């Protein structure tokens, strides 16, 4: 039996320079097997402080672990596909709040908006207008943690 492989969709907050207990209103939605390790990776490339504010567990229950692992990646492809799909669903839910890199650069008073790699790809969101608490409530209501293959079968049969 393969040991459970936990994967998560996470939300990371960018912190204010002047008061690192306050969020700037910009958040990154991504996926990782270890959100705390991913936070540390992101922090090394970001001058502002970052804080993990929410995770959504997307792993399967202990009875669904018989799927073979990919020998090259040593990952369970069923889980990776699911986690990637869940991340995409959550990101699409908030597409109207997605930040273009130059919007974040301007907000942070960086003049060279052509250097779009400074703040990474399109996984950053501007939630200043709706607030992170509402975002988390919407995610938790719409995307409960994955319960395994049985949940997928039931949703296909009855919906």
List PLM regions with ranges.
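Non-catalytic accessory segments flanking enzymatic or RNA/DNA-binding domains
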Residues: 1-159
């Amino acid at each position: 039996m393969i040991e459970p492989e936990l994967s998560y969709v996470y939300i990371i907050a960018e912190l204010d320079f002047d008061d690192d207990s306050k969020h700037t209103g910009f958040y990154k939605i991504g996926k990782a097997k270890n959100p705390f390790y991913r936070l540390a990776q992101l922090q090394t490339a970001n001058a502002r402080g970052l804080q993990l504010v929410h995770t959504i567990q997307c792993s399967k229950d202990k009875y669904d672990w018989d799927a073979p692992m990919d020998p090259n990646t040593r990952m369970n492809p069923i889980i990776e596909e699911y986690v990637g799909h869940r991340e995409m669903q959550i990101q699409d839910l908030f597409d109207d709040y997605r930040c273009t890199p130059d919007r974040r650069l301007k907000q942070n008073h960086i003049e060279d908006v052509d250097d779009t790699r400074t703040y990474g790809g399109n996984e950053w969101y501007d939630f200043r207008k709706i607030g992170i608490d509402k975002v988390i409530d919407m995610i938790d209501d719409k995307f409960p943690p994955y319960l395994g293959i049985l949940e997928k079968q039931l949703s296909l049969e009855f919906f």
